[in-house]
Amino acid sequence: STYLEHHLGVLRHGHGRHIWFEVSGAPSDASSLLTAELRLHQAPTHSVEPADLYTVVVHRVNSVDNLGGMQMEQVAAVNTSASAEGWLEFNVTAALASWLGAPADNRGFFITLHPHTQP
């Protein structure tokens, strides 16, 4: 089941997106959680070289200070190319299990895109 209720605005931190998931509708017993997956749909881009490679990284936000600075930990990463189209899948089971046990710790995910550098 999906428990995404809303997508709040964007916080700037490099070139990324900060997204929150309302998980209060999910069962609070994390021991019954088998797996949790975040899926992002990628459309091909025509503004860059189609063969360009990128890594999409999902970070769990641990804290946000008064100036918008974030302490984060990497949860999952997927490599893709600029010409790829389809769903990128990220295993976020550990983060969701933690949030189910301590909902106040749910500060969302921060998603970043990193180009691969050519030698």
Question: What is each of the regions a protein language model found here?
Answer:
Residues 1-42:
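A short beta-strand-loop element at or near the start of a globular domain
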Residues 17, 40, 64-119:
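Cysteine-clustered segments with highest specificity for TGF-beta superfamily mature ligands
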Residues 1, 58, 96-99:
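Generic hydrophobic, helix-prone segments enriched in Leu/Val/Ile
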Residues 2-4, 21, 53-57, 72-77:
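Generic detector of short, locally flexible boundary/turn motifs and exposed helical patches
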Residues 33-34, 48-59:
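Short coil-to-beta strand junction motifs in C2/discoidin
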Residues 8-11, 27-31, 44-49, 77-80, ...:
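Beta-strand elements of modular eukaryotic interaction domains
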